[in-house]
């Protein structure tokens, strides 16, 4: 079976991950002690994607929980789902990374990383046919970003041919937790470009917007935000875990979504998002789901898909529905909004259908898009990065842990290259020879304007 080993790193990663395990356990009918209490054999048929069956038919999540301080892991241990996890899979140090990427990547994290890789190796050895890893972390702090990227590169060395999918919480434009977020994020993106296969970009501000605008929550908590993310996480792998008419897995996703190896940063969305109060007044239909997943207000990262073009996209529908209708709707989206899709990749939407809907719903849809507008997110981080780096603000915290300024410069230029690659493909067209010169000229003009504005 196609198992996935789940690794959650740092405070954010562990909180999102804990919520994810609640959602998946509910879908498979597993209670907090790890025993099966479900009502249909379909829940057990491919349960071993995320769970390992141990003696006494107890199901244990294939999860590795990592942090540089004990706090969050202790609270997961004490929570209602704490007893599900294998106690050996909790790995933590005492000192914390203090929002410092260098501590997570080079000093504190480097001491812990070997023991984490051992745990990951044990989990991988329990698998018949390991498909890949999913990593949950944030890029703004120290542990998730520093230790998270270190772990990704270590796992990559050991399992070079397995998929590496990350759920990365990006720093938001308006909501900032720490001053040094731009540094941590830029250094992390530098690593993710090289070592990850698929990066799902999430950011808190977009999640807050969904909670305020769509779900009508007046005071959204992190629990609410994490619940949104976990819905997408479970949706992406639904096809692996339940029988479906059109299946997809992490590798099929990558093959269909990534036209060029560096461009693997995705926007994700989920439907139906409705306020609890309005739940009873909504009929769910395939056209409505399709319309909602392509809506910019549904994206979980603060980039507007209307500012860019889709290179590729993928949608996973769950529930009893006709595949013909799904295909028609997807085709309709493409023909109606053809200017938002690049014309040099015909039929660039992949759709898959899974027969089992999420708990308590008739149908749902998960969306993953590779849109050039994601460059907005990198540009924003890049501007904040260069503003601080020009003055060498806060650098001593990083150089003190043995980093070199050169690494910052490299990370910055790698991210700038990424932005210009996205821009290049946004402007590219089918008959490109003539166009390319124009695009370069335009691109040059655009950059100058931006500099003046700034």
Swiss-Prot record:
Q: Which is a Gene Ontology cellular component entry for this protein? A: microtubule
Q: Does the keyword Isomerase apply?
A: no
Answer whether the UniProt record assigns the keyword Nucleus to this protein: yes
* Molecular-function GO terms, alphabetical: GTP binding; GTPase activity; metal ion binding; structural constituent of cytoskeleton
Question: What is one GO biological process annotated to this record?
Answer: microtubule-based process
Matching SMART domains:
Tubulin, Tubulin_C
Keyword entries, A-Z:
Cytoplasm, Cytoskeleton, GTP-binding, Magnesium, Metal-binding, Microtubule, Nucleotide-binding, Nucleus
Cofactor names from the entry are: Mg(2+)
Q: Where is this region: Disordered?
A: 426-454
Give coiled-coil spans as residue ranges. none
Function, as annotated, reads:
Tubulin is the major constituent of microtubules, a cylinder consisting of laterally associated linear protofilaments composed of alpha- and beta-tubulin heterodimers. Microtubules grow by the addition of GTP-tubulin dimers to the microtubule end, where a stabilizing cap forms. Below the cap, tubulin dimers are in GDP-bound state, owing to GTPase activity of alpha-tubulin. This is the major beta tubulin of mitotic spindle.
Can you say what this protein is called?
Tubulin beta-2 chain
* Gene name tied to this protein: BETC
């Amino acid at each position: 079976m196609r198992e996935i080993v789940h690794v959650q790193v740092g405070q954010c990663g562990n909180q999102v991950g804990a919520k994810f395990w609640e959602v998946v356990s509910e879908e498979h009918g597993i209670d907090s002690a790890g025993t099966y209490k479900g009502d249909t054999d379909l829940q057990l048929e491919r349960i071993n994607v995320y769970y390992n069956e141990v003696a006494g038919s107890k199901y244990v999540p294939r999860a590795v929980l990592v942090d540089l301080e004990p706090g969050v892991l202790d609270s997961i241990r004490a929570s209602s789902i704490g007893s599900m996890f294998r106690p050996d899979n909790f790995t933590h140090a005492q000192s914390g990374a203090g929002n410092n990427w260098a501590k997570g990547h080079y000093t504190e994290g480097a001491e812990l990383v070997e023991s984490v890789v051992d745990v990951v190796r044990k989990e991988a050895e329990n698998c018949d046919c390991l498909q890949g890893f999913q990593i949950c972390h944030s890029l703004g702090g120290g542990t998730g970003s520093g230790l998270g990227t270190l772990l990704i590169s270590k796992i990559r060395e050991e399992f070079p041919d397995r998929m590496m999918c990350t759920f990365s919480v990006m720093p938001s434009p308006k909501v900032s937790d720490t001053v040094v977020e731009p540094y941590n994020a830029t250094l992390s993106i530098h690593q993710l470009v090289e070592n990850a296969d698929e990066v799902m970009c999430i950011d808190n501000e977009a999640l807050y917007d969904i909670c305020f605008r769509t779900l009508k929550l007046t005071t959204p908590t992190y629990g609410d935000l994490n619940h949104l993310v976990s819905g997408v996480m479970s949706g992406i792998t639904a096809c692996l875990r339940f029988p479906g008419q059109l299946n997809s897995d992490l590798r099929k996703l990558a093959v269909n979504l990534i036209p060029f190896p560096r461009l693997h940063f995705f926007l994700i969305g989920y439907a139906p998002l409705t306020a609890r109060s309005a739940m009873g007044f909504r009929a769910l239909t395939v056209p409505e789901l399709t319309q909602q997943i392509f809506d910019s207000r549904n994206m979980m990262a603060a980039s507007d898909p209307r500012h860019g073009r889709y290179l590729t996209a993928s949608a996973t529908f769950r529930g009893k529905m006709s595949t013909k209708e799904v295909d028609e709707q997807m085709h309709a989206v493409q023909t109606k909004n053809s200017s938002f899709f690049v014309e040099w990749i015909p039929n660039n939407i992949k759709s898959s259908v899974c027969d089992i809907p999420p708990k308590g719903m008739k149908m749902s849809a998960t969306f993953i898009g590779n849109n050039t507008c994601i460059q907005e997110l990198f540009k924003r981080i890049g501007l904040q990065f260069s503003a601080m780096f020009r003055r060498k603000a806060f650098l001593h915290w990083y150089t003190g842990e043995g980093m070199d300024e050169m690494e910052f410069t490299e990370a910055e230029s790698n991210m700038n290259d990424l932005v210009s690659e996205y821009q290049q493909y946004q402007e590219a067209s089918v008959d490109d020879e003539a166009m390319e010169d124009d695009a370069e000229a335009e691109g040059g003009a655009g950059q100058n304007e931006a500099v003046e504005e700034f």
